[in-house]
Amino acid sequence: AKIVLDRFHIIQHLSRAMMTTRIDIMKTFDTRSLPYRSMKNHWRILQKDSRKLSLNRFFSRTFGQTITPREVVQKTLNFSEELKFYYELYQILLFHFQEMNSKYFFELLEDNLDLVNPAFKTVFKT
C-alpha cells in the first residue's frame, strides 16, 4: 500500500507538530508566568502564517497593552530560544510549501531532521 498525502494533510501535520511543540515548551514554565500565559492565550497567532498577520492593534490582556500580532509573536518568541527555532522553521516550511518550492522544502526537511523533536521528526519522515 502506498500512502499519498495531499496539500491539506501536509500542512495539518506540520501545524499539529508546531502545536505539540508549543505546548511542550509552555509546560516548562509556571502556569501564572507571562511566558506561559502568552503561549497559551495567543496560540492562534503563533500558528498563523507570518505573512498573513494583521497590522491592526488590539488590547492584549496578557501583556496589558495595545499591541499588533507581530509584536505578540516577537515578545512570545523572546521567552524561549527553542520556541523561536521551531517557529522560524515552521514559517519557512510553510512559505516554501505554499510557494511550491519543493526543492527548498525537502532540503529543509533533510537538513533539520537531526535537530528537531519527535513531533517534527514524524512530519519529516512522512
Task: Walk through the language-model features, giving the residues of each.
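Short, surface-exposed amphipathic charged segments that create phosphate/polyanion-binding patches used
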Residues: 15-27
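Acidic/histidine-rich catalytic cores and adjacent linkers
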Residues: 1-2, 8-15, 31-126
